[in-house]
Amino acid sequence: SEKDRMYRVLGRIRRFQREHGSVQVKSRWAYAKRLNTELGRKIAGAVAGYAEENHADVIVFEYLETKGKISGRKKQKLHLWRKRDIQKRCEHQAHRRGMRISRICAWNTSRLACDGSGTVVRDPDNHSLCTFQNGKRYNCDLSASYNIGARYFIRELLKPLPATERSLLEAKVPSVKRRISCVYADLRELFSEMELLRAA
């Protein structure tokens, strides 16, 4: 895949840098950056295209802190830069197609299980898989995606409500107060409580 290709290029740069020093590696980093730009363009197009095919109104992203200088190793800089680039390109494409972009707090979306069982344990051999506290095996990215979507819907469900009704729901589902720990299970519980409140 394109992602694997990028990792191979970064591996070759790392080996070359160890053997020849950092001065002679500039052209190789320039190639990696061009490859990164192309990868960002393809991913952004695929995301916007998929959203349009499925008649989505909104594309939800994790909020990335984009102010100030990016610190850290070049590999980390490149990775964060691609995330920013993808979001920016997606935003332009989404607006052209009549869709909105929304961002939610990124904290703990990957660390917490979508079923509300607690923190996940990453598989040491396959980093894309994890184990929930209840023993369930799950895909890490899928669990995080559920949590990202849940945080968006929790915010959108609570925002238009009168203060008294919102406070009542937050008392019944206390976890929705802290957005940094909201998961998909909290959305389901909130929705059930809203249905009961309407039926009363």
Features from the language model and the residues they span:
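Positively charged, helix-rich recognition surfaces that bind polyanionic ligands
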Residues: 1-200
